[in-house]
Structures are given as structure tokens and as C-alpha cells.
């Protein structure tokens, strides 16, 4: 495959995904890219610095994610038999997988937008939707609260695919010190792919995502493509 052509495909997917993110911030794509490119934060209030941190992290992560995703799709197509229909793989990645991924990008970004505008002393409580679709492991975390300043990254939704949990302000004292064996709750509930959070400047999709496990021969071309795209937006 031609690397320049492949890079264009990757960048188109990354920008589409980033578009899902920036609309949650109430800005358009061009404005978001200007914010990412501008490294001078000296004139920004704290909430705007957090906002920029989230946008930079999102674009950085989504470029890597799109590079890995398109590479995985190419690998799957390579493994096909001649009689197999490539449209099946296109549909799988560009419709089935992408729909779930875009939904999680939207949700992680919505949480981040809300987060950056909260004072550090706010107490935040983890909540579920309270219906039959809630996973038992997520229900076990309901009501757990921390100050924003020390809120664990792993507890910021989404913490798994299609997670609908959310955070609310609590006006009682944080209760995390009252909870026994928090480590086991984490292990049961949190998908490692989501152990970091955009709200704290982490990636949307973590390094544990299977897309990032690729054939060794693709690693260097992937790094080159990702770096080329990021350099356009002053991400180093």
C-alpha cells in the first residue's frame, strides 16, 4: 500500500473522530486545531488550560488510534482468502466498530467538558443509570466519592465500552476512606483500555486496546505516519 495514500486515510479517520470530541466542547474543528497548535498558555485561565490539555491529548491519542485501527483493517484484509468479500471488513471497522468508538469518544469528551469547569475542591460521586443494563461491577462503585483534586483517573467514566455511568457533585464529605478493598473493585469494573481519562489529560483509548498490538513490520511505518500527522498540529 502507498504510505502517502494510507496516511491520508488515517488522517481522515482521526479528524472525523476528533470532530466528535470538539463538538462536545462547543467549538468547531478549526477553532480546536488552533487551540492545539498554540503552545502559549500564559494568558489562559486554569479552566482553559485544562480544556487545551484535553484537546491536545484527544488529538494525540486519536491520531495514534486511527493509525492503529487502519493498520489492523489492512492486516485483516491481507489475511483474507481471494474469495472473501473485502466489503465485509470495511463494514466491520467503519460501521460496527466505529459506531461504538465514536460513542465512547463523545461520552469521554462530554465528561471532560464538565470536569474542566469544576472547582478543585468539589466533591464528586460516581453514579450508574440504575437500570437493568448496569453491570454489577459498575453498580458496586455507585456512591463512591472523592474530592476532584484527588479523584482517581480510573473512576472517571467511561470505564468500559458503552459505559453510561456518570459523576455528580456531592455535598457530603468524600467517603472513599470508608470503602474496603477499593483495589478489587477497580479490578472487577475497569477495562484497562479506559483506565486513563481525557478529563485529566489522558488518552480516550489506552495502550491496552488490541488495535495497538500489530505485526512488527508495521510498527515503524505506523510511527512515521502518526508523527507526520501530529507535526501538522504542533504535537510532539
What name fits each language-model region?
Residues 1-160, 168-236:
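Domain-core detector
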Amino acid at each position: 500500500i502507498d504510505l502517502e495514500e494510507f496516511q491520508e486515510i488515517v488522517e481522515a479517520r482521526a479528524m472525523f473522530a476528533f470532530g466528535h470530541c470538539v463538538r462536545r466542547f462547543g467549538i468547531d474543528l478549526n477553532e480546536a486545531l488552533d487551540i492545539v497548535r498554540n503552545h502559549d498558555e500564559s494568558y489562559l485561565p486554569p479552566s482553559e488550560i485544562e480544556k487545551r490539555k484535553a484537546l491536545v491529548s484527544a488529538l494525540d491519542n486519536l491520531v495514534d488510534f486511527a493509525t492503529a485501527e487502519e493498520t489492523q483493517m489492512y492486516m485483516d484484509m491481507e489475511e483474507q482468502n481471494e474469495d472473501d468479500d473485502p466489503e465485509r471488513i470495511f463494514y466491520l471497522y467503519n460501521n460496527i466498530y466505529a459506531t461504538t468508538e465514536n460513542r465512547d469518544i463523545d461520552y469521554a469528551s462530554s465528561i471532560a467538558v464538565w470536569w474542566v469547569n469544576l472547582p478543585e475542591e468539589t466533591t464528586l460521586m460516581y453514579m450508574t443509570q440504575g437500570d437493568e443494563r448496569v453491570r454489577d461491577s459498575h453498580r458496586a462503585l455507585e456512591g463512591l466519592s472523592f474530592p476532584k483534586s484527588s479523584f482517581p483517573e480510573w473512576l472517571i467514566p467511561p470505564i468500559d465500552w458503552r459505559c453510561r455511568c456518570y459523576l455528580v457533585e456531592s455535598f457530603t464529605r468524600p467517603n472513599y476512606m470508608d470503602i474496603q478493598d477499593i483495589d478489587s473493585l477497580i479490578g472487577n469494573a475497569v477495562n484497562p483500555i479506559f483506565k486513563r481519562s481525557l478529563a485529566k489529560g489522558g488518552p480516550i483509548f489506552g495502550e491496552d486496546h488490541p488495535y495497538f498490538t500489530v505485526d512488527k513490520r508495521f510498527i515503524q511505518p505506523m510511527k512515521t505516519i502518526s508523527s507526520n500527522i501530529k507535526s501538522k498540529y504542533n504535537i510532539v
